[in-house]
Curated annotation (Swiss-Prot):
Coiled coil (UniProt feature): none
GO molecular function list: rRNA binding; structural constituent of ribosome
Gene Ontology, cellular component aspect: ribonucleoprotein complex; ribosome
Name assigned to this protein: Large ribosomal subunit protein uL24
Annotated Gene3D superfamilies: 2.30.30.30
Function as written in the Swiss-Prot or TrEMBL entry: One of two assembly initiator proteins, it binds directly to the 5'-end of the 23S rRNA, where it nucleates assembly of the 50S subunit. One of the proteins that surrounds the polypeptide exit tunnel on the outside of the subunit.
Similarity-based family: Belongs to the universal ribosomal protein uL24 family.
Highest taxon above the source species: Bacteria
UniProt keyword list: Ribonucleoprotein, Ribosomal protein, RNA-binding, rRNA-binding
One biological process term in Gene Ontology: translation
Matches recorded under Pfam families: KOW, ribosomal_L24
Subunit structure: Part of the 50S ribosomal subunit.
Length: 114
């Protein structure tokens, strides 16, 4: 299945305790249908000490959130939107905004080099 939301996309949370929060996708977990978004779904983790390496304590970290709870923000119209797919004249499959019909390029963080 094609990824509608990829690493580097700007998204808004539409459900849950962080509803309305915006952030960039730091990591995409496609097998679990989850994403990690900067500044969203902050949890506290109790860490054990490892002698000589790290100190014990409580750290705050971003936990994964289900991909159905976030919506892509279109870089062209600036609104939360659903994502569609279509083929260009060259036969390349691209994402597009369902509101303004503009092609949404994949962020530089996600682009693969061959």
């Amino acid at each position: 299945m094609a990824e509608k939301i990829v690493t580097g996309d700007e998204v808004i949370v539409i459900r849950g305790k962080d509803r309305g929060a915006r952030g960039r996708v730091r990591q995409n977990l496609p097998r679990e249908d989850r994403v990690i978004v900067e500044g969203v779904n902050i949890v506290k983790k109790h860490q054990r000490a490892i002698p000589g390496v790290r100190q014990a304590g409580i750290i705050e970290m971003e936990a994964p959130i289900h991909v159905s709870k976030v919506m892509l923000i279109c870089p062209h119209c600036g609104k939360p939107t659903r994502v569609g797919f279509r083929f260009t004249e060259t036969g390349e499959k691209v994402r597009y905004c369902k509101k303004c019909q503009q092609v949404i390029e994949k962020p530089a963080l996600h682009r693969r080099t061959k």
